[in-house]
C-alpha cells in the first residue's frame, strides 16, 4: 500500500513525540508549518501548558512586506518566540519539528531561535 505525504508526516510526528517531551526545566519548542503560515510554541508537557507562542498571524509579522509563508517570516517567528521565552526565563528547549522535514521554513525557525539565545 502506497503511503501518501499526509500519512508519512503523521507517522514521523508520532515517532518524534514518543521520544521528545517537554519538562518545566526544558520545555518543547513545537513548530507547525501550514501552506500560508508558521506557528511556534514553547510547551511544558508535564503540566500541559503553552508557555510562549508566536506565529505569522500576529499583527507585527503579518504586516511585513514579505509574505507569511517565506523563510524570512519564519526567521522572524523564531526570533520572536526566543525573545518571549527568554523574558519568561526559559533558556533551553527541545526542538519538535512536528513531523516536517528539517529544511526550509522549519530550519529557519530553529536557526533564528538559536541565534536569539535558545539552547537546543
Swiss-Prot record:
Superkingdom of origin organism: Bacteria
Any one biological process term the GO annotation gives: translation
UniProt keyword terms in alphabetical order: Ribonucleoprotein, Ribosomal protein, RNA-binding, rRNA-binding
Keyword RNA-binding carried by entry: yes
Cellular component per GO, a single term: cytosolic large ribosomal subunit
GO molecular function: 5S rRNA binding; structural constituent of ribosome
Segments forming a coiled coil: none
Stored InterPro entries: Ribosomal_uL18_bac-type, Ribosomal_uL18_bac/euk
Region (Disordered): 1-22
Compositional bias of kind Basic residues: 8-20
Keyword Metal-binding listed: no
Subunit structure: Part of the 50S ribosomal subunit; part of the 5S rRNA/L5/L18/L25 subcomplex. Contacts the 5S and 23S rRNAs.
Primary role: This is one of the proteins that bind and probably mediate the attachment of the 5S RNA into the large ribosomal subunit, where it forms part of the central protuberance.
Family: Belongs to the universal ribosomal protein uL18 family.
Official protein name in the record: Large ribosomal subunit protein uL18
Organism: Gloeobacter violaceus (strain ATCC 29082 / PCC 7421)
Gene from which this protein is expressed: rplR
Amino acid at each position: 500500500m502506497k503511503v501518501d505525504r499526509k500519512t508519512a508526516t503523521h507517522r514521523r510526528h508520532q515517532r518524534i513525540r514518543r521520544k521528545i517531551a517537554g519538562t518545566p526545566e526544558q520545555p518543547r519548542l513545537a513548530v507547525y508549518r501550514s501552506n500560508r503560515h508558521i506557528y511556534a510554541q514553547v510547551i511544558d508537557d508535564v503540566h500541559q501548558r503553552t508557555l510562549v507562542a508566536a506565529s505569522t498571524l500576529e499583527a507585527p509579522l503579518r504586516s511585513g512586506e514579505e509574505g507569511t509563508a517565506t523563510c524570512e517570516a519564519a526567521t522572524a517567528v523564531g526570533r520572536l518566540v526566543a525573545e518571549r521565552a527568554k523574558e519568561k526565563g526559559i533558556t533551553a528547549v527541545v526542538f519538535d519539528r512536528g513531523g516536517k522535514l528539517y529544511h526550509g521554513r522549519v530550519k529557519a525557525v530553529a536557526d533564528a531561535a538559536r541565534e536569539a539565545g535558545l539552547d537546543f
